[in-house]
C-alpha cells in the first residue's frame, strides 16, 4: 500500500506535467481554460499511454521509456513555469509581476487550488487516496489477469511487440492499449518486481470527479443530470473496489467512459442556457479524442464515438477547417499505434473481427480461428457456453441469460429496457428544440443581414466591410455572442438528443452483442441514469417554479433538492455499508507495504526452436513470472533466429 502511494505520487506528477504541457496550445489559441488538476492528469495519462504504445513498436517499455518521458515532462514544466505558477499560485508576487504582460483575466481565473479548496475538501481527497490505495493493494485478481494480462504486460516491458504474438496465445490479439500504460508504470526495472496499480489510479481520479460533482450539487442547491451520473460512477467504483488490484482492460474502459461522459454532461449543462461559441467547441473536441482512446482500450466502447458528431457539427458550422483537420490528425495519432500493434500481433486490424482483411503477412491468425474466437466471446457473455449454439434466437437465449444474472443486475437491465421508449421521446424533443432554435437563429441572421445592407447603402465606399461590421454588431447586441457562436447556439439541444441516442445505441450494442455485465457496466448505468435523471430534473424545476419566484407552496420549491438529498443518504448508507464490509474482509491481508503480486501458477514446459515456453496446469493461470507462456502446446515456430522475430504457424 505504501509503495502504491509512492508510485501514485510519481504518476500524478508525471501525468499532470505531461497533460499541462500538451494542453497548452488549446489554452492559448483555443481559449480552453482548465482549472482541474484531475483533467490535466487524465490528459497526461492519455499522452503517456499513446507514447508507450509508440515506444513499444521499437523497443521494450522500461527504463529508457521512463527516462525520456520524465525528461520531456521536466522540460515542459520549465518552459511553462509561469503558467504553472498561475495555476497553483505558488507565489502571489510571481503571479502579479507579469501583470502587464499577461491578461488580468487569466490570472484571476487561475485561482490557487490551495485557497479554493478548504481543509475539509482536501481531507476528503486524502481519504479517497488512502481508500483506493488500500483497495488497489489487495483483493481479487481477475481470472484473465492470470490467464494473459500479466503476460501481455511483460511482453511489452521486455520486447515491446513481436510479430505473430497471437500465435503463441490468441488472447494477446485483443491488444488493449491499457497494457502499454501498465507496462510503463510497472517499474520492474527499478524495484525488481512488477507493480499493477494504474487501474486503481484511474479509479481514484474518477472518484475525485464524482466527489467534486456532488460537492457542486451541494453548493448550487439544484439537481442536474450530472449528479445522477456521479452516483452511477460511485456505484461502479464500489462494485469493482476489491478488483482494482487487477490491470483488467474492462475497468480502464469503463472508468474512462464514466469520466468522459460526466465531463461532457457538465459542459452541456453549463451551456444549455447560453450561446455556444468557439471556446466551448474545444472541450468537446478534446473529449472526443479521449473517446478515440477509450476505443483503443476496449474496442466495444467504440459505439460511444457517436458523440463525436456534436463537436464535428459545431466546427463545420463555424467553418473551422484547420481545426477539423487538426483534430482528425490527433485522432489518427492516437489510434495508429494501437492499429499497428494489432497488425503486428495478429495480422488483423481489429482482432478477432475479420471484416477487414488487408495484410497478407505470414504470421496472420487464420480467419476461421479468429471468427471462432469472436463467437466464443459472445457465447460466454450470453450464458450459452457452446459456440455451436450461438445462433439461438433472441427469445431463446435472452430469458436464460436474464435468469443467470444477479438480483441487482436484473433491476439495472430492466431499468435500461424501461428507459428506451422514454429516451426516444426525449431525443425527439431535443431535436425539435434544436430546429426551433435554428429557425430563430436564421430569422435573427436575416435581420442582421438587412441591417448590414442598410449600412452598406449609407457607406457605399466600402460595401463589404460595412456589411460585415453591421452584421456583427447586430448579432452581438441581440444575441450576446459573436457570429460563429450564433451559427451554433441553436445546436445545444442537439447535444442532449445525441447523448440519448448514444445511451440507447450503447445499451442495445451491449445487450444484443456480448451482454456480460463486466463488459458493459457503463452502458447498463448510463441509459437509465440519463433518462430518469432527466425526468427527475424536469420535475424538480417544475416544482421550483420560474426564476422570478415560486407561486405555489414554499415547501415545494426545494422538494426536488431535498428528495435527491434523501436519495443520496439512502444510497451512501447502503453502498457505504457494503464498502465497509469489503474493507474489513481485506484488512487481514499483509499488503500494507507492497502490493499483492500476480498469481504464480504451476506450469509445464516445452520448446519452440530452442525457446522454453510455459504451459499452465491450473485452469490456465500462469501469471507474470513464468515467461513466456501459451495456454496449450502450440504448433508454431520462430520466424527467424530469435524471439524478437516473432512466431508463426508451422507450415503443413
Regions found by a protein language model. Name each.
Residues 17, 21, 25, 202-217, ...:
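Hydrophobic, aromatic-rich transmembrane alpha-helices
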Residues 1-91:
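Membrane-embedded, hydrophobic transmembrane alpha-helices
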Residues 77, 101, 108-111, 304-332, ...:
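Perimembrane helix-loop-helix junctions
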Residues 131-226, 244-246:
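Active-site lumenal/periplasmic loops and adjacent helix-entry segments of GT-C-fold
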Residues 53-56, 241, 283-299, 303-310, ...:
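Membrane-interface alpha helices of multi-pass inner-membrane proteins
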Residues 120-131, 289, 315-343, 358, ...:
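Hydrophobic alpha-helical membrane-interfacial segments at the cytosolic entry of transmembrane helices
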Residues 363-390, 555-652:
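Intrinsically disordered, polar/acidic, low-complexity terminal segments
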Residues 137-140, 181, 325-405, 412, ...:
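Membrane-lumen/periplasm interface segments of specific transmembrane helices
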